[in-house]
């Protein structure tokens, strides 16, 4: 078998209708030719996002906790934000979000992974970056809505991994990003 990877498929789109136009994302209904026939699928048309696993010199991960209405929970997350600035590359979005959400900048950046969050229901792709060499910065960014009472903590990477594996931390972007970061750090340690 060749290198294992997802495969892009370009099907003929017979029709594509905007079913719902939202403030952040839309819902579309596409009919495509597939095999000998056609199929129709509805999905969330999402702008995508960038997220940051920010790890300090003591191997603590910067986490935020905020209310998420669809799940009716205050879940733990890594800093992240929508790719909603035209022409802004994902890395720049990640840098902006790290500053806006937790008043930090980083000296070293590394792309960890890009992932589809729910490919059966939306087209969102999240680009996750590892940030190290953290430093505090002053910002005048005004946090509102869910961000207004956001809690920020630094938690040992090993404890976050334990929380993910035990099912106590269920945010998919946090889980995937932290597990990827832990593996990158493990591989780096093995080569030194």
What do these predicted ranges mean?
Residues 1-21:
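Extreme N-terminal tail/first-helix region
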Residues 2-8, 74, 111, 119-122, ...:
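Nudix hydrolase/Nudix homology domain
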Residues 8, 41-46, 51-96, 138, ...:
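Conserved Nudix-box catalytic region and its N-terminal flanking loop in Nudix hydrolases
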Residues 27-31, 53, 63, 128-130, ...:
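Conserved hydrophobic/aromatic beta-strand scaffold that supports enzyme active sites
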Residues 28-36, 118-138:
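Active-site-adjacent beta-strand/loop module that shapes the phosphate/pyrophosphate-binding cleft
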Residues 15-18, 113-118:
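Short, solvent-exposed loop/turn elements at beta->coil junctions and helix N-caps
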Residues 12, 105-112:
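A short coil-to-beta-strand element that immediately follows conserved catalytic motifs
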Residues 15-51, 57:
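Acidic, metal-coordinating catalytic segment for phosphate/diphosphate chemistry
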């Amino acid at each position: 078998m060749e290198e294992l990877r997802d495969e892009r498929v370009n099907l003929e789109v017979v029709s594509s209708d905007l079913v719902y136009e939202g403030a952040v994302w839309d819902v579309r209904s596409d009919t495509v030719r597939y095999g000998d026939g056609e199929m129709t699928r509805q999905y969330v048309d999402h702008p995508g996002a960038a997220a940051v696993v920010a790890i300090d010199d003591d191997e603590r991960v910067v986490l935020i906790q905020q209310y998420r209405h669809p799940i009716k929970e205050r879940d733990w997350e890594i800093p992240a934000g929508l790719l909603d600035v035209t022409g802004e590359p994902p890395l720049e979005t990640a840098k902006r979000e790290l500053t806006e959400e937790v008043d930090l900048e980083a000296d070293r950046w590394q792309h960890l992974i890009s992932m589809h969050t729910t490919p059966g229901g939306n087209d969102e792709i999240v680009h996750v970056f590892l940030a190290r060499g953290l430093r505090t910065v002053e910002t005048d960014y005004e946090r509102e809505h869910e961000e207004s009472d956001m809690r920020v903590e630094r938690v040992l990477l090993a404890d976050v991994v334990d929380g993910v594996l035990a099912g106590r931390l269920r945010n998919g972007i946090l889980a995937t990003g932290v597990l990827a970061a832990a593996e990158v750090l493990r591989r780096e340690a093995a080569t030194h």
